[in-house]
Amino acid sequence: ICSGLVGSEMCIRDRKKSEFSLLNVWATWCINCKLEHGFLMAKKNEGWNIVGLNYKDDLEQAFKWLDQYGNPYSVNLYDQDGTYGFNLGVSGAPETYLLREDKILQKHIGIMSEKVWKDKFIPLINN
């Protein structure tokens, strides 16, 4: 079981087959991450599984940030040097991915919002 901020990419694969998940790349230094945080908290409250990738950040600051703003993530991966992000093709934070099984169905660069959710993610979920 993975909890808190961990450094194991295996945590992503522990979810049930055919379940949709979100992977959100975030950091405490990212102003836009704060702007989309309410959206992520709402999705968590709707029952969505959201995996966080804390990107090129300070671990202590990340814990403080989650304590202050709330933690929408079921699991957080700590990517201090950007290795996981590099492997995903991350260009910066925030970025959000829609996952099903081991496949990336959608990638959104920038702030997640209801409009982005409805325009880019819902059609793939309903398909």
PLM feature segments, named:
Residues 48, 74-75:
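Short, conserved active-site loop motifs that form the nucleotide-linked donor/cofactor pocket
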Residues 13-34:
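Short active-site neighborhood of thiol/selenol oxidoreductases, capturing the structured segment around
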Residues 25-27, 53-56, 79-81, 109-111:
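Active-site-proximal beta-strand/loop segments in catalytic clefts of secreted hydrolases
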Residues 34-69, 80-86:
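Structural microenvironment flanking redox-active thiols in thiol-disulfide oxidoreductases
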Residues 22-23, 50, 96:
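Hydrophobic beta-strand anchors of alpha/beta hydrolase catalytic cores
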Residues 31, 41, 105:
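Nucleotide phosphate-binding site architecture
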Residues 1-12:
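Single conserved hydrophobic/aromatic residue that forms the stacking wall/gate
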Residues 68-72, 79-125:
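Thiol/disulfide oxidoreductase modules built on the thioredoxin-like
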